[in-house]
């Protein structure tokens, strides 16, 4: 990097995703590094030359240093915070049809979704929405599964349900069904897809693997 592009400071911003109990906000889980100074969460200042273990907060003794370090942060936050939003997965794209969704991409308000086969194999009673972007309006086939299609495993549930773009569909699942199919008309635009698979006791988990296929354009 040339001299004109060189920075004398570094900003570290940690964002742990929906597993965090609070929504991302300025200063939380942040650190600004410059020379021997470390400003934590915009409040705690440490001098690594005299205090490498960062035990003594000297923010009150060094207000000018705190002010200087804080001046770097908000322009940085304003540039990156718009990107801390759910990404919508394309449906009905000419380059990716059908779209295969997995529970790893559920957007949970708190905690993490089932994201590995060890968790999914326990058929947890949890579900969440996929943020999706219907790129082509038309008739879609939505197939609910608890395992990838390649596993060729039947659904362990008696009833399935979907909700998308204000449309709700529900139907009985017959024994040995590999994938529960719904067909719905979808308009173009961003929306959410949520799925439920109910057992005989009424407990519901989501369809951890769901295929969405555009079958007829409108």
Where do the protein language model's features map onto the residues?
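Active-site rim elements
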Residues: 17-19, 24, 28, 54-61, ...
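C-terminal cap/loop subdomain of S1 sulfatases and analogous C-terminal strand-loop tails that border
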Residues: 1-48, 79-83, 94, 108-109
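Long, internal low-complexity/basic segments
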Residues: 58-218
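Intrinsically disordered, low-complexity polar regions and short flexible loop motifs
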Residues: 51
């Amino acid at each position: 990097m040339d001299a004109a592009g060189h920075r004398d400071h570094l900003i570290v911003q940690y964002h742990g995703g929906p597993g965090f109990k609070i929504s991302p906000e300025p200063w939380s889980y942040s650190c600004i590094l410059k020379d021997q100074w470390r400003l934590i969460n915009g409040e705690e200042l440490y001098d690594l030359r005299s205090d490498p273990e960062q035990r003594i907060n000297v923010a009150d003794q060094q207000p000018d240093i705190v002010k200087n370090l804080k001046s770097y942060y908000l322009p940085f936050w304003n540039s990156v915070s718009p990107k801390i939003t759910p990404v919508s997965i394309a449906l009905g794209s000419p380059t990716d049809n059908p779209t295969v969704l997995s529970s790893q991409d559920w957007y949970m308000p708190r905690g993490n979704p089932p994201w590995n086969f060890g968790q999914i194999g326990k058929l947890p009673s949890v579900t969440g929405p996929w943020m999706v972007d219907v790129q082509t309006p038309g008739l879609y086939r939505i197939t609910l599964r608890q395992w990838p299609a390649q596993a060729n495993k039947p659904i362990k549930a008696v009833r399935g349900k979907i909700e998308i773009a204000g449309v709700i569909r529900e139907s009985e699942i017959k024994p040995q069904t590999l994938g529960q199919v719904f067909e719905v008309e979808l308009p173009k635009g961003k929306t959410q897809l949520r799925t439920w698979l109910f057992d005989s006791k009424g407990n519901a988990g989501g369809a951890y693997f769901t295929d969405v296929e555009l079958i007829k354009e409108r």
